[in-house]
Amino acid sequence: MPIRVQDELPAVNFLRNENVFVMTTTRATTQEIRPLKVLILNLMPKKIETENQFLRLLSNSPLQVDIQLLRIDARESRNTPAEHLNNFYCNFDEICDQNFDGLIVTGAPLGLVEFNDVAYWPQIKQVLEWAKDHVTSTLFVCWAVQAALNILYGIPKQTRAEKISGVYEHHILHPHALLTRGFDDSFLAPHSRYADFPAGLIRDYTDLEILAETEEGDAYLFASKDKRIAFVTGHPEYDANTLASEYFRDVEAGLNPEIPHNYFPQNDPQNKPRATWRSHGNLLFANWLNYYVYQITPYDLRHMNPTLE
């Protein structure tokens, strides 16, 4: 949350030069507060597990957040009870005339599927186009990053020959960026993807600012300068055992997967993994909620015109 000081305090300019968020008394006394409305487009098969992961991160904030779950795939789910979907999810036509402070688009196990072969690809494009006028800030995660880069920037699908799976080290590029506020200079985060995100490609074909990279030079965290869209190519929401579940699933399927990198103690799948990215995930989502959503969203969502001033 921002600190509140008198307007004329010399520290105001000093801290703002470091991009520390300072709220003057004038702004604080005129700012109105209400619950934030956040829409989650859940594309993962195990929807309840994914809900738990994202809601855990979103709850770690002093801000009150009202969550709406969205589905766009009308096919019968093999992993989530129909009763759960009917009770807790809405369809797009039920919310398309509403505005939201935030939108999160989750990953999906579609790394080897061409975009046009995705059953709900037209609906994905519809939601992203709608969000331009109805959402203050959208956060894309893993596969959703690849989809958004294609829809919003025309970047073709980039696929790795081998799946990247494990916990990788990253470093921040802009220490004073709001989205990386409080991050360590280097931090760990999980990845589980075929998608490839070369930092050079992002720089050459978009106006997005890369805020953190992997040690191998892949873009991990990047965003638009107006804070309307943000992208995270990994899975900071994952539980300690999620990568293990994926690994053993693929073993049972006879896929001969590589052991996830830097994940099992002593690189032994029989050892219980430990989450080494939990603080990073909590801080990332808290920063997004505060700086990219709360601080720029209009109080009256009927007038969607996000601004920093």
From Swiss-Prot:
It is an enzyme of class 2 (transferase). The record marks 111 as: Important for acyl-CoA specificity. Keywords: Acyltransferase, Amino-acid biosynthesis, Cytoplasm, Methionine biosynthesis, Transferase. One of its GO terms (biological process) is L-methionine biosynthetic process from homoserine via O-succinyl-L-homoserine and cystathionine. It is found in: Cytoplasm. The keyword DNA-binding does not apply. Substrate binds at residues 163, 192, 249. Its main location: cytoplasm. The keyword Cytoplasm applies. Pfam families: HTS. The active site is at 142 (acyl-thioester intermediate), 235 (proton acceptor), 237. GO terms for molecular function: homoserine O-acetyltransferase activity; homoserine O-succinyltransferase activity. Its EC number is 2.3.1.46. Pathway: Amino-acid biosynthesis; L-methionine biosynthesis via de novo pathway; O-succinyl-L-homoserine from L-homoserine: step 1/1. Belongs to the MetA family. HAMAP family: MetA_acyltransf (MF_00295). Transfers a succinyl group from succinyl-CoA to L-homoserine, forming succinyl-L-homoserine. This is Homoserine O-succinyltransferase. It comes from Klebsiella pneumoniae subsp. pneumoniae (strain ATCC 700721 / MGH 78578). The lineage of its organism: Bacteria, Pseudomonadati, Pseudomonadota, Gammaproteobacteria, Enterobacterales. The gene is metAS.
